Amino acid sequence: MSPIIDIYCHIYPDRYFQEMIRIAPNLENIGKRLRSVTKLFDLDARFKEMDEFGDYRQIISLPNPAIEDIARPDVGLNLARIANDAMAELCRKYPERFPAFAAALCMTDVDGSVAEARRAVNDLGARGVLLYTNVAGRPLDDPEFEPIFAALAELDLPIWLHPVGTAAMPDYPAEKKSRFEMWWCFHWP
C-alpha cells in the first residue's frame, strides 16, 4: 500500500519557537496558547498520532504568525534561516516521518528571501516554499516581490499558500474584530 503523504502540516521546531518568542516578546500570550496545541511541539505525541494512520508522512512547514509580521527584515531573515535549518534537520533525522519541508522566507527582505529560497532548496533540500497570503498587509502581487517570484519560478517547486489574518481583522463587515476567531483557519487574504 502506498504511503499517505500529508502536504500541509505545521510544526514549531523548538529552536525557531524560542527565537521567535525572544525577538517578539509580545507573542508570549499567543505562545502559551500555541503551546496548548501539543503536536506542534511534542514529537512523541505527534508520532503517536501519525502511527494511527499507518504509513503516514508529513511535509512540514511553519504555522502562523508570518515571520514578516513579527520581525524587522534583517532579524526576520535570520529567523527564516533558523526555521529552515531546523526543519531540514528534522527531515534528516526522521525521513520516514518528514520526507520534506516547505521553506520559510521573510518576504520583507526581498534580496534575502531570494538567497534564502535558493539556500533552502539547493543546500537544505526544501521541496517548496510557504508564503502567507499577505505580506505585512500588502498583497503578494506587489511589484516589490517580483524578484522573489522570479527566483521561485527558476527553482520550479511548489508554493504553499497559507491564509493569514489576525483577531483584529473582522470576519464580517458588521464586526469590529474577529468574534469567532475564524482567522485561525480561514483568511484570504
State each model region's role.
Residues 1-189:
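Helix-coil boundary/capping segments in enzymes
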